[in-house]
Amino acid sequence: MRLVAIVACLMVMTADAAAEQRYALVISGASGGQKYAEQMAEWRNGIRAALVDRYGFSPDDVRIFVDETVKTGGEQGTAQNVRAAIATLSKRLTKDDVLFIVLLGHGTYDGEAAKFNLVGPDLTAADWGTLLNGLPARLVMVNTTAASFPFLEPLSGPNRIVITATDSAAQKYATVFPDYFVKAMNEASTDLDKNGRTSIFEVFAAASLAVKQHYEKRGQLLTERALFDDNGDRVGREADATGPDGALARTLYLDAELPAAADNPELAALIQRRRELEAEAEAMKAKKASMPGPLWEAEYEKLMLELARVSREIKAKS
């Protein structure tokens, strides 16, 4: 009962607004026709609206890359423009920042290399791995295309959340995942634990469930299973699967923490400590089935008490 009370208290105390800077690249490539161009425009607009209006991203830090049919409202989704944007960000990003990248459109796999189809020359999964290598920020990479699965392994790494719309390189048909991912970003019900914030995992889980329901309602075989990896082991898992993933994705939120921490090193250190404790708590949850009940509860309660103490300090200093 005591542990329940501690957790309930923490849910209130950690529902504060991030000291980090948050950046987003929303990238559309070649449209493949007017139907897809209109669909991608809807997704881009939905993501931008969610990031800026719902989660408080600065409009200047959300860069939109459009397909070849669009003449205004964004930069062309070319390899050159994408490379330039990432090069610019690499000079600004710090280890505390968040970079959120979403790929919208089409992908291909020829048996050797998976590609995201851009306007002009494409970028392979290996190209993306090279582009993002060495970035200090926490990275969220969401590839919503059919040929997204082969992107998971080369992009996996520490402080990275990689999401793919499919679990097989053989998937060739257009995915419904991006539609439900965008909807999940915009819906209050996505906050599954009701702590007032929306984590990457919550968006992923909500979108994954909606995809399954999409196929079930139509009496169709489920042909796409979204995966995520957030522990750098290069192994993707579905949202409802057990395993070591989840600690980072459950504690990396789309909305911001405390802006005041930017000018307060002590507060920033406390927020960093809270992140670490939250990640430890998620890791402890994964160990519950493999530990004796009393031992697990004792260790988890100790962790929750420390998290409560740090959260109280953050609240007092903010």
Regions found by a protein language model. Give the residues of each.
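Second-shell loop/turn segments in exported
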Residues: 30-38, 67-76, 113-119, 165-171, ...
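Active-site-proximal C-terminal subdomain of hydrolase catalytic domains
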Residues: 45, 140-230
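Caspase-like cysteine protease fold
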Residues: 191-278
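Active-site-proximal beta-strand/loop segments in catalytic clefts of secreted hydrolases
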Residues: 27-31, 65-69, 102-106, 119-121, ...
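Boundary/activation segment at the start of structured domains
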Residues: 16-100, 114-115, 247-256, 315-318
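Alpha-helical, heptad-rich or low-complexity scaffold/stalk segments
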Residues: 144, 263-264, 270-271, 278-316
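A short, glycine/acidic-enriched catalytic loop
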Residues: 77, 103-135
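Bacterial N-terminal signal peptides
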Residues: 2-14
